[in-house]
Amino acid sequence: MTLATRTVTLPGGLQATLVHQPQADRAAALARVAAGSHHEPSRFPGLAHLLEHLLFYGGERYQDDDRLMGWVQRQGGSVNATTLARHSAFFFEVAADALADGVARLQEMLQAPLLLREDIQREVAVIDAEYRLIQQHEPSRREAAVRHAASAPAAFRRFQVGSADALAGDLAALQAALGDFHRTHYVARRMQLWLQGPQSLEALGELAARFAAGLAAGEAPPPAPPLRLGEFTALQLAVSSQPALWRCPLIALSDNVTLLREFLLDEAPGSLMAGLRQRRLAGDVALNWLYQDRHLGWLALVFASDRPEEVDRQITHWLQALQQTTPEQQQHYYQLSRRRFQALSPLDQLRQRAFGFAPGAPPAGFADFCAALQVAPSVSLACQTVSPGEPVATQGFSLPLSRWRRRPESDPALAFAFYPQAAGDLVAKCPEKAAPLLHLPSPGDPPRLLLRPPFYCSPDQAEGLARGEQLRPLLAALRHAGGHGEWHLFDGSWQLTLQLPEPGRRPEAILQAILRQLALPVASLTPSPESIAIRHLMAQLPERLGTSGHQKGWLAALAGGSAEDAQWVARQLSLITAPVNPPMPAPAPCRRGVERLVYPGGDTALLVFIPLPDGASLAALRLLAQHCEPLFFQRLRVEQQIGYVVSCRYQRVADRDGLLMALQSPDRRAGELLRCGKDFLRQLAPMDEATFRPLQQRLAAQIRASRPPEARALSALRQEYGLPELTPQAVDALRVAEVADLAREMTRRRRRWQVLFTTGD
């Protein structure tokens, strides 16, 4: 479905894009400013990044946890910002009826920030901690290596992240520079706004007009200086793990980039990625923007590979093959890109519109685009496990960077095939028997099948990744047939979701191949190491909580579709040799204790999972977590400056519900972080009715909001097997005393906690 969209230029020059999304229960806003790291004064590298942080302190009207960050957290929404080379962006998503209140807060923080000295000092410390983190962040190091190949403008090689050394000196001068930067760039003619929600275009237009009111017009942004590459554009970066090839061309901005991305991400038989995997040349691929100005883009095609020469040659063959695709094939992939975009949340759609890969006009001139891409100025970076040479200092990093001297290779070109293709002789017989299937009928909606291992029995990460590798080409083939499938880790448990095409296009052969694949054994794959300590702990937590052994079988639920659809799916499920929807044995108790995990780097990370006590109210836990989240952030991140990762929230992990505290700090020990978490819970003031009622109302609205089909299917399975699941009735019946009792119980019984931590080098 194409969403009604309108772009308007408001008095003063602000451009607003309004997107009407009927029946949506969420809404989003994104403001983009034409100012980033390349615009900051050379005296204060990192100033644009620092200003991004400071703007969240807001202005005079909204104070403390009523500012955008804390307010969105209390709404159960999401909020963030980013500083790029030539842009900064601020964005949030909330329930649709809260959009206007969020836009009012966004308006004030961007138009009239306080920029107080004590806030500046506080955020300089945070920026410095982030700088120390990013020193060991492998993706950031690799991006910096590519940017080093640019000879102009000089900002590409300049330090941009910010640090205490760069920013903490003359506080008065820094405050003045921040004010000057804000007055120059945060003006109507250098700002764009995107709003998306179920509101009418007229109502969204009124919101945009209110946002623009009071903005100084300012001057239009100057054109970007020409981007020129240096003498050496084939580079090699010595790495300890995760070898890769980065192929990074400079291209004129075009809607064809999104179409190229769809061809690139395809994993069906005949695709580039299927061929590379078959020859063991590459594992994964990603397409990212390194840089964008008004007319030019710098793309990064990133392949996980230890054979960069062979992959680079196959990319060239692939670009040649793309020039021969037919208009019908290009239209097919264009429609796939639209389906990929429409599946995103409102906020992610706006992010793609502002600086990503939102589909634009239908394909035009794609062959010429691919031909131009093949000869475009480009940087190649081979990340290889070789002995590091002399380091190169660039952008605040010390990188073992050298010239890449390619080895000769002569692999034959892959045989590429593009879709749609004739069905051929692929015919499948429908089984006669039917397996048990839990069905949530909704004849007007397409059937969505959820398959997952029995509760508390999810495979570990290595086995789950291997299963995903087996399913990749089949799920891609399903996508070309009009369906969609995804094998992914959800709340610490692996699950498969399959959206099936309409009855006249049922791809029985593909579905049966997928189901048969589930019965085959898999060889474990070693997960890629996480680049941030707290993410490493999160990846390890599901296995640390324990499982109930390895019960064979699969749980299956179908959301949507008719009784006839359910009968057809149940017959297909009979092909699974393991039991479907088997009885569940009593779960093993949740593991507890304190464990240190080895992780390289200088930071300390702490993860505390406090499980919901047996028989306690899940509704009380959810409400308690909503209450704690902004208070925890305010106390430990803003007031105590513990570190840059500060989170306390409800989390389901490997089918167990609990309260999760996550902290990462460059200078605090694990014991100190744990003590901070304990003190927060011990000193949490008893909740009164005035605090309780708005939280209860918000939780009731969340549980009554429409949910994706796979979420409804999982909820039905949990209820079928007697696991805790949030219901509107439980939220309505909740009382403040239950929340207070639960808080005391979870705080007091600390021996039931599961604590994971890493310590710095």
Curated annotation (Swiss-Prot):
Pfam family, one: PqqF-like_C_4
One of the protein's GO biological processes: pyrroloquinoline quinone biosynthetic process
Top-level taxon of origin: Bacteria
Documented EC number(s): 3.4.24.-
Names of required cofactors: Zn(2+)
Residues binding Zn(2+), per UniProt: H49, H53, E130
Cofactor note: Binds 1 zinc ion per subunit.
Keyword Cytoplasm attributed: no
Pathway membership: Cofactor biosynthesis; pyrroloquinoline quinone biosynthesis
Keyword annotations: Hydrolase, Metal-binding, Metalloprotease, PQQ biosynthesis, Protease, Zinc
Family assignment from sequence similarity: Belongs to the peptidase M16 family.
Job description of the protein: Required for coenzyme pyrroloquinoline quinone (PQQ) biosynthesis. It is thought that this protein is a protease that cleaves peptides bond in a small peptide (gene pqqA), providing the glutamate and tyrosine residues which are necessary for the synthesis of PQQ.
PANTHER family: INSULIN-DEGRADING ENZYME-RELATED, NARDILYSIN
Full protein name: Coenzyme PQQ synthesis protein F
